[in-house]
Amino acid sequence: MKALHFGAGNIGRGFIGKLLADAGIQLTFADVNQVVLDALNARHSYQVHVVGETEQVDTVSGVDAVSSIGDDVVDLIAQVDLVTTAVGPVVLERIAPAIAKGLVKRKEQGNESPLNIIACENMVRGTTQLKGHVMNALPEDAKAWVEEHVGFVDSAVDRIVPPSASATNDPLEVTVETFSEWIVDKTQFKGTLPNIPGMELTDNLMAFVERKLFTLNTGHAITAYLGKLAGHQTIRDAILDEKIRAVVKGAMEESGAVLIKRYDFDADKHAAYIQKILGRFENPYLKDDVERVGRQPLRKLSAGDRLIKPLLGTLEYGLPHKNLIEGIAAAMHFRSEDDPQAQELAALIADKGPQAALAQISGLDANSEVVSEAVTAYKAMQ
């Protein structure tokens, strides 16, 4: 089996690329970073530090790389069995034209073996969004062929991969946590379902997407925002602060109550999942900076994201949300000189006041009870 993976960054190398290569799949990375491309093509291998209770070093081998903006990537799409991405939500639109060209070439070459494309991004149904961009870039006469022969498979991914400065200045070395979860929608594949260790197939993807968003992402963000306010440097430092831990755990329990109601999750199993996530935040090997995790607060405070979406669920089912409100208030306080969204957030609050600013960012009604609760909590933190 041959695969092409867009994005040779830390997540690409440390998570999806590693799983594919470990499964014995012939893997090519596509990226724009020439330093990384040259290193991959010179060595065809790299090291991954897997850290949890203990630390181990795995070597990923037998890989190569092409530029994601050259002709080679188009040729590969015409030949491979699987295309995956870990490029970030914004970049999906940028890689769509190359994918479309590759699919046209595949059709012209008469290659009718099924191709499956899986976007492994921190977003809900990212592959469906990528499909929209690809279809827009395709000529009309290729669209029906692509619908017939190409599967666009949505997925949910979970592994903490912080940016790590390699002690050896190796551009390929990467550190990841032991835990990883890659869940894909088995109803969207073309051809035979793949058997890749570490890839879990489900016919109920949204339950897993929301479980991760409402627990890992909600908890991670609130830990970062409260941690930054309290002067902590890392996620570990923040979650070991008992006051912060109580709010984070409380928020994950509030969002969890929504999941249990919505998807009939087992309450005990979900409580264990929350405990496991708190343990991941404590990982001493992951130097996960609160400022990195907190960045892009406007996106994280938007209606479909990790803070407001679970809050809307609590309103839908009439459930408590005190700790989620604390997290939202802390997010409104997030300041970072390196993050344009943090600066935009500060300017918006200064210009409109916290009530109107939160309503504009989140889509919540400015006169609603929850906005007033969040504003009260926000002011109490000043």
Swiss-Prot record:
Enzyme class, spelled out: oxidoreductase
Keyword entries, A-Z: Acetylation, NAD, Oxidoreductase
SUPFAM superfamilies recorded: 6-phosphogluconate dehydrogenase C-terminal domain-like, NAD(P)-binding Rossmann-fold domains
Entry EC number(s): 1.1.1.17
Catalysed reaction equations from the record: D-mannitol 1-phosphate + NAD(+) = beta-D-fructose 6-phosphate + NADH + H(+)
One Pfam family named in its UniProt record: Mannitol_dh
Disulfides per UniProt: none
Highest taxon above the source species: Bacteria
Lineage of origin: Bacteria, Pseudomonadati, Pseudomonadota, Gammaproteobacteria, Enterobacterales
GO molecular function annotations of the record: mannitol-1-phosphate 5-dehydrogenase activity
PROSITE patterns referenced in this protein's UniProt entry, alphabetically: MANNITOL_DHGENASE
One GO cellular component, as annotated: cytosol
Keyword NAD among UniProt keywords: yes
Binding site for NAD(+): 3-14
Gene Ontology biological process terms in this record: mannitol catabolic process
NCBIfam families: PRK02318.1-2, PRK02318.1-3, PRK02318.1-4, PRK02318.2-2, PRK02318.2-5
Modified residues (N6-acetyllysine): 269
InterPro entries: 6-PGluconate_DH-like_C_sf (IPR008927), 6PGD_dom2 (IPR013328), Mannitol_1_phos_5_DH (IPR023028), Mannitol_DH (IPR000669), Mannitol_DH_C (IPR013118), Mannitol_DH_CS (IPR023027), Mannitol_DH_N (IPR013131), NAD(P)-bd_dom_sf (IPR036291)
Entry's family note: Belongs to the mannitol dehydrogenase family.
Protein name: Mannitol-1-phosphate 5-dehydrogenase
Coiled-coil stretches noted in the UniProt entry, renumbered to this chain: none
